[in-house]
A protein has these predicted regions:
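A short beta-loop-alpha structural element at the N-terminal edge
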Residues: 2-16
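A short helix-loop-beta-strand connector motif used in the catalytic cores of GNAT acetyltransferases and
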Residues: 42-56, 73
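Conserved GNAT acetyl-CoA-binding A-motif
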Residues: 100-111
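C-terminal "cap" of GNAT-fold acetyltransferases
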Residues: 109, 113-120, 125-175, 180-186, ...
Length: 213
């Protein structure tokens, strides 16, 4: 299984994965005003706009995780809770750095919300360096919310094709034994059923079905 470009069928599950992951990581550490504006619908809208530049790991319609790049910024990287600890984040990071290199970016950057210790550890583990604290505009419905973040940067060194391939193959072998998210689209009813059995996707699917993605 390789990292791939997102498809329209990924939209609803990706938005849900992103929203859940954001809440898990950020609710305890961001201002309440930002948390209140960060609704599931807002993540659906943002994912619909950014889907063409999303890279995904996992089956179509049942992603394990994704990353999003904007210019020289690794803007987002999230993994479904069920798939954490299996190397998914590392595979996504490898792909993100490759995409940035291919785009001619020598020193990309990313923003990590202050207090997000798990994300900070992963950044450091994968060779990113904390360079400063800065304020970034966090997107909310109808505007932006100023959020202080840790800014990480990394100088992308050229790696041999063999070393990159070997690392990816090792991680993919580990992923083969991991069971992905249990949620997905019921082919008979067209309802997107979450892992806890909630038929959330019909509402989202109806909304998203009218969009041009």
């Amino acid at each position: 299984m390789s990292v791939r470009t997102a498809e329209p069928a990924d939209l609803a599950p990706l938005a849900l994965l992103w929203w859940r992951g954001w809440r898990d990581a950020h609710l305890p550490i961001v201002p309440k005003a930002l948390a209140a504006r960060s609704t599931l619908d807002s993540f659906i809208d943002r994912m619909a706009v950014t889907l063409p530049r999303i890279r995904v790991l996992g089956p179509v319609g049942a992603p394990f995780g994704f990353h999003m790049i904007r210019g020289d910024e690794l803007q987002q990287l999230y993994v479904a809770e069920e798939s954490r600890g299996a190397g998914v984040a590392t595979l996504l990071m490898i792909d993100a750095e490759h995409c940035l290199q291919q785009a001619g970016v020598a020193t990309p950057w990313l923003g990590c919300a202050i207090g997000n210790a798990r994300a900070a550890r992963f950044c450091q583990k994968t060779g990113w360096t904390l360079v400063r604290t800065q304020t970034l505009p966090s997107e909310i419905p109808g505007g932006w919310f100023p959020l202080k973040v840790w800014r990480y940067e990394k100088t992308l060194a050229q790696r041999s094709a063999w070393s990159a391939r070997a690392e990816s193959e090792l991680l993919e072998a580990r992923l083969a034994s991991v069971r992905g998210p249990t949620e997905g689209m019921d082919r008979e009813t067209g309802v997107y059923v979450t892992a806890d059995g909630i038929p959330w996707g019909r509402r989202a699917g109806d909304r998203l079905g009218s969009r041009q993605v």
